[in-house]
Every structure is written in C-alpha cells, then in structure tokens.
Amino acid sequence: MKDLKELRDQIDVIDRQIVDLYQERMEIAAGVAEYKINTGKKVFDKEREDSKLATLTALGKTDFNKHGIRELFEQIMSMSRKRQYQLLTAHGMYENRILQKWKV
C-alpha cells in the first residue's frame, strides 16, 4: 500500500495538469469568441453542449464518475461561456445584441 504522502503527491501532479489544461481551454475559448465576433454567432449553443456532455459523460467508467464528469464539464462550459461573453462585451458585441433584441 502506498503511503498518504505519495498518494497526495500524485494528486498534486494531476491537479497541476488539470490547471494547465483548463487555462489552455480558456485560451481556445477566446479564439472561439473571436470567431463568433467575426461571424455574429451566438455564444450559447445548447445542441452542441448537450451533445458534448453526452459524449463526455459516456466516457465515465462508473455511474459516480459519469455524474462527476457531467458536473465538471457543465462548470467548465459555463466558465467558457463567461469568458466568451467577456470578450464579446469588450468588443461591444454583447450590448449591441441586447439593444437589437429590445430595439433600443
């Protein structure tokens, strides 16, 4: 049996990898926002997110892991949308869409 320190060290390594991957994902989300700025596409694509969540959840080996994977990616996708909205707002796009919706 491994000792507790060794197990925690392994978790620490994985946690740093997760942080690096999260930051890389947010950089890519900024690129997605740039694409959407240039094409006028909406940030939220329910069909895409639902499909992605189903695919990722299916990768879980147990029901517990499937549930956790779904929660994890729902949060990651939410943060990705927030980042995209942030960039759209910085470019004046989000306010323009709201104004157009309400015809102000």
Task: Please provide the spans of the model-predicted regions.
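Domain-level signature for soluble enzymes in the chorismate/prephenate branch of the shikimate pathway
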Residues: 1-104
